[in-house]
Amino acid sequence: MLNIGFGNYISPQRLLAIVSPDSAPIKRLILEAREHHHLIDATHGRRTRAVLVLDGEIIVLSALHPETLVARLSPPP
């Protein structure tokens, strides 16, 4: 399981991409996911720093930086 912050976890097998929320296409993706009830906000009211795209059109918002999440995904040396 991948810790995405604040005691929230996702299955790494379902993860397709970890992206920054700053670009216009990602903002549109978040808006569409919210409209279709496919959005999970795991930021606990903090700023969104990473957008996780899961299979099944699920979008997850995280307050952790994408680099932090990738480091947690990578196996320890």
Swiss-Prot record:
Disulfide pattern: none
Pfam families: RemA-like
InterPro entries: RemA-like (IPR007169)
HAMAP family xref list: RemA (MF_01503)
UniProt similarity note: Belongs to the RemA family.
Name the UniProt record assigns to this protein: Putative regulatory protein tsl2331
Gene source species: Thermosynechococcus vestitus (strain NIES-2133 / IAM M-273 / BP-1)
